[in-house]
Amino acid sequence: DALFALGGGVTGDLTGFAAATYQRGIAFFQIPTTLLAAVDSSVGGKTAINLPEGKNQVGAFYQPMAVFCDPDTLGTLPDEEYRCGCAEVIKYAVLGDAEFFDFLEAENIRDNEEEVIAHCVKMKRDIVQADEFDKGKRKLLNLGHTIGHAVEKLSGFEISHGDAVAIGMAAVVRKCNDGKRVIGLLEKYGLPTVCPYS
């Protein structure tokens, strides 16, 4: 028996959680079809579902057998959905890869999808290998997510995950030395940088 998660982050999370809990765990495979899932949620084994009380309230750490990513599927995404994945890509650049940050400022993600996806997956792989269960270094991957999850909840989940993470990152870096550069990069990709709630 095996499950296949063909879709975005929600599909991957739900499928991974079902695979982790059905018969105490069966094989599953991730086949991400969104940029966000390709660079982030399909990799690393975090699976969770939302409850009315908040995001990712019930879940498990459960690794897929493999992740298969075909960048051609990203061409079918509406601009808004594609933009959401850009927030997660930028997160990796902000986490300490100055060369990647410079690349994202100078180039366009859409024109360099394979290279960008491979770079983000490698960064996440390295972090997860060092801290699979989110006890230390992996917490860096939550950049923008604490505030972002609150924004999502306050909006009744009308604000997308990517937009909420962008708002969260902007809030966190606003007073940092390179905060203006980070906010400028988010804005380059059409991401919001101001929280609509006070």
Each model region followed by its residue ranges:
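Residue-level recognition of specific faces of alpha-helices
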Residues: 2, 27, 35, 119, ...
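Gly/Ser/Thr-rich beta-alpha loop segments that engage phosphate groups in nucleotides
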Residues: 9-14, 46-47, 61, 146, ...
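Active-site nucleophile and cofactor-binding loops and adjacent substrate-binding regions
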Residues: 6-8, 32, 160-162
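Single, functionally critical "micro-switch" positions that shape active/binding sites
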Residues: 8, 31, 69, 143-144
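Active-site segments that bind and position negatively charged phosphate/pyrophosphate groups
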Residues: 103, 107-197
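Anion-binding (especially nucleotide phosphate/pyrophosphate-binding) glycine-rich loop
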Residues: 1-25
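A glycine/threonine-rich phosphate-anchoring loop and its flanking beta-alpha core
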Residues: 16-107
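Short phosphate-engaging motifs
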Residues: 11, 96, 178
